[in-house]
């Protein structure tokens, strides 16, 4: 638990600095009529309840912050190149439970303002490289403090499209293709 807290706290600080993001608190619930709750796939039912001080209005536990983050960027006056990061706590009552999924969600999230001209593949790749730079730095910090918790990452990120993966491994499932390409580029647990 202490390693998880260390990674989370340090990553948020380093990532926020690298990406020019400010920490903003996210709501636990929103008024149903606000339209800010994301219905995900359209079939998940949000947890809903009433609050004594809010007459004739139900509130819903947030399921996703997608709409809220964009509203917050505008409301707080963020400019291109600036953004926010936040933490979402949610209950997803229709989640299919397994080793990776729970009905309780504790999710870290971020959003940044970009210009129309920046909506392109190169901006996406530059953003991924910046994120990877922080992750690589974190790998070293974590190794120094918790050597047993580290996975060895490659020195640089590799980009490949779904089509390129399918062409390279035509008889494999998408998950098998992912596993094969990560082994090839050494992004695996050691």
Predicted regions and their residues:
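Long, highly charged amphipathic alpha-helices
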Residues: 6, 10, 126-137
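Short, flexible, solvent-exposed loop/turn segments with mixed acidic/basic and small polar residues
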Residues: 98-103, 178-180
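Metal-assisted phosphate- and nucleotidyl-transfer catalytic regions
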Residues: 130-189
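Well-ordered alpha/beta subsegment
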Residues: 115-117, 121-125
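Class II aminoacyl-tRNA synthetase-like tRNA-binding/catalytic domains
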Residues: 1-101, 109-113
């Amino acid at each position: 638990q202490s390693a998880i807290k260390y990674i989370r706290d340090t990553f948020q600080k380093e990532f926020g600095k690298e990406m020019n993001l400010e920490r903003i608190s996210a709501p636990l619930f929103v008024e149903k009529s606000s339209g800010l709750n994301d219905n995900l796939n359209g079939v998940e039912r949000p947890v809903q309840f009433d609050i004594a001080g809010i007459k004739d209005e139900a509130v819903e536990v947030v399921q996703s912050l997608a709409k809220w983050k964009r509203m917050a960027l505008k409301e707080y006056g963020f400019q291109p190149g600036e953004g926010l990061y936040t933490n979402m706590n949610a209950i997803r009552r229709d989640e299919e439970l397994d080793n990776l999924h729970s009905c309780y969600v504790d999710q870290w999230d971020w959003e940044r303002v970009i210009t129309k001209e920046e909506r392109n593949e190169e901006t996406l790749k530059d953003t991924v490289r910046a994120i990877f730079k922080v992750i690589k730095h974190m790998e070293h910090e974590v190794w120094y403090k918790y050597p047993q918790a580290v996975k060895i990452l490659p020195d640089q990120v590799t980009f490949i499209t779904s089509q390129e993966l399918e062409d390279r491994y035509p008889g494999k499932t998408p998950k098998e293709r992912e596993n094969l390409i990560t082994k090839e580029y050494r992004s695996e647990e050691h």
